């Protein structure tokens, strides 16, 4: 049964959340974790239909939404919510391949980000990740909903899927792009919140050229293989998840594996090799800083660093290192970011050459002088 609540906790009433899950136990657990961190839980719901009513009544800052629920599930609820009472949504997803697939669909429908529940419904796993859950909720609260729902609105207008939404991006032709490249181009892209849709948009608009690309998206290990598959389907590039010792050349891309850092280990004759490690000194894994710094140290050919939407400061040190090594550097504009965190911090280092709207990033990658 849907209900409003008063779990304000006494520390910080500025952030208000509605918790949606078909399991009363999970609703209580998530609500208690948020309340203990000073987040006000102002409502709960057991399915999507109830969620629509509670959100309309309470007008929260964030909704945490389970995916699989009886009646109206999370996917339909997200879409209806964006139409009726637009509110930032954090999906709570099972830590499985199936959970990854439905989560990407939820992001396409307007959800801002997702929290992967360790072990699916195992409550102890969620408790161990309480700090990460609270951080995710706070991050989502600051999202630009217009940017988060842009792909869906354009897809609906075009009457097609994500590729139809991306087709409006202005990019040079493949032949023009190749003519602009002074030798093999290596590209490192870093992103976090809002990144899956943004990276897909850039990759689908990027023309075939003599590029090799490494993508670092903050994402758990169970999700990165499917993310690589989606990019492979959406773009002209051969995209796969990074593995230890993997090599790529022209027209190929790697997605950093969740749970490991991807370091560029060597670069010879236009081909680069990566190694994976589990260094826990970084605040996030995988970290764009690690990949970007290694690119700056190893790649002696034309090099481009790109920072897309995301919370936090990852990629700021890496983009500075790439700039110091002579790379061209690009950051996504505030107006088109779901979260203007990572690009903002990158710009503040003084190491960003160009700030671009999302639809101009692909053209900037291949159109400048490296």
Where are these regions (language model features)?
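Conserved acid/base catalytic micro-environments in cytosolic active-site loops
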Residues: 3-7, 11, 24-32, 44, ...
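Extreme N-terminal starter segment of soluble prokaryotic enzymes
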Residues: 13-16
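Conserved acidic carboxylate
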Residues: 21
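A generic structural motif
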Residues: 37-42, 58, 209-212
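Acidic, metal-coordinating helix/loop segments flanking the phosphotransfer/catalytic sites
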Residues: 44-62
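Negatively charged
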Residues: 65
């Amino acid at each position: 049964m849907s209900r409003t609540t008063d779990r304000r906790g006494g520390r910080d009433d500025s952030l208000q959340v509605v918790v949606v899950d078909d399991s009363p136990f999970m609703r209580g657990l998530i609500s208690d974790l948020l309340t203990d961190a000073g987040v006000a839980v102002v409502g709960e719901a057991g399915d999507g239909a109830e969620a629509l009513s509670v959100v309309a009544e309470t007008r929260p800052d964030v909704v945490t939404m389970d995916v699989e629920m009886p009646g109206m599930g999370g996917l339909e609820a997200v879409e209806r919510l964006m139409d009726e009472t637009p509110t930032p949504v954090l999906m709570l997803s099972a830590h499985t391949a199936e959970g990854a697939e439905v989560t990407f669909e939820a992001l396409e429908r307007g959800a801002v980000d997702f929290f992967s529940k360790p072990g699916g419904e195992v409550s102890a796993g969620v408790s161990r990740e309480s700090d990460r859950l609270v951080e995710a909720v706070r991050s989502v609260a600051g999202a630009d909903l217009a940017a988060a729902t842009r792909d869906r609105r354009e897809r609906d207008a075009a009457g097609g899927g994500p590729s139809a939404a991306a087709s409006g991006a202005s990019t040079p032709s493949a032949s023009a792009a190749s003519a602009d490249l002074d030798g093999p181009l290596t590209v490192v892209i870093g992103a976090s919140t809002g990144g899956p849709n943004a990276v897909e948009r850039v990759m689908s608009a990027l023309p075939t050229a003599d590029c090799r690309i490494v993508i670092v998206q903050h994402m758990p290990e169970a999700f990165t293989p499917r993310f690589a598959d989606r990019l492979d389907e959406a773009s002209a590039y051969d995209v796969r998840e990074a593995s230890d010792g993997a090599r790529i050349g022209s027209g190929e891309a790697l997605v950093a594996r969740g749970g490991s850092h991807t370091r560029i280990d060597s670069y010879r004759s236009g081909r680069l090799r990566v190694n994976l490690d589990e260094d826990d000194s970084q605040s996030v894994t995988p970290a764009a800083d690690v990949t970007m710094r290694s690119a700056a140290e190893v790649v002696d050919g034309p090099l481009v660093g790109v920072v897309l939407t995301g919370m936090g400061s990852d990629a700021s040190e890496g983009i500075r290192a790439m700039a110091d090594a002579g790379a061209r550097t690009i950051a996504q504009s505030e107006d088109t970011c779901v979260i203007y965190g990572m690009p903002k911090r990158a710009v503040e280092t003084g190491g960003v050459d160009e700030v671009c709207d999302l639809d101009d990033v692909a053209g900037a990658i291949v159109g400048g002088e490296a």
